[in-house]
Amino acid sequence: FTTIEALREFDPAFINVTFHRESIKETLTPDGHIEWHRMRRRPGTVGISAAIRDRFGIEVVPHLICGGLSRYDIEDALIDMDFLGLHNVLALRGDCGPNERHFMPHPQGHSHAIDLVRQIAAMNRGEFVDGEVEECHHSKFSIGVAGYPEKHVDALDAESDLRHLKAKVDAGADYVMTQICYDADRILAFISRCREAGIDVPVIPGVKPLSTLRQLTLLPETFAIELPEALRS
């Protein structure tokens, strides 16, 4: 909570809470078989989000990802969020898992963020993974998706990347949160291209405060972005 305390003086409208995949640990059983166990050594996204909201009174936007989760896992997380009054969610595919060269979805999960958006939108209509429909209870999630002013690293080109974003909005996304970008001109150009493509939902620039010089090298490598020369110097 120390980091949140330092941000309070700026009166943030909301705080994003990222989602980290659980670690996988293999153990050897006495009979020589290998067992895989999912491990987590810190609180999860839902718990952290509720704690920040309740302790500081700041709106939170928990991230929810496809990676490592089945549709039922995702549904459980959404049920908890809805019960706790966490009604904003950023729907993402997520990064590759450990030792993965390419993204590998859970066998019962989603391959793309658009499918996650569809699942959340379905829950807003009272529709669940097993086909049951609850007419008396609909969740009220506001769904955010990621946009990439500098193109997603896996996209063929900027045009196809924008088409994917338009599809996510058409599937039920209420707003776009951009990938980290420190170039105002690039952000404005991206928003202009979104409007030309028929994407009329709000587009919120994503900015991460820089706290160390090392991040000037680490962030471009991690997020496939460019830093303006003025910022580097």
Segments (PLM) and residue ranges:
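Flexible, glycine-rich active-site loops centered on histidine and acidic residues
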Residues: 71-122
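Active-site pocket-lining/capping segments in soluble small-molecule metabolic enzymes
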Residues: 94, 107-140, 145-154, 161, ...
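Generic structural signal for well-ordered alpha-helices
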Residues: 4-5, 45-50, 78, 114-121, ...
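Active-site glycine-rich loop that binds ribose-phosphate moieties when present
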Residues: 154-171
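Hydrophobic faces of well-ordered beta-strands that scaffold small-molecule active sites
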Residues: 1, 13-17, 60-64, 89-91, ...
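Catalytic cores of alpha/beta
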Residues: 70-83, 160-164, 189-195, 212-218
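Acidic (Asp/Glu)-rich catalytic clusters
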Residues: 4-11, 47-57, 78-86, 133-138, ...
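Glycine-rich, proline-tolerant flexible connector loops at the mouths of alpha/beta enzymes
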Residues: 6-43, 94-108, 173-190
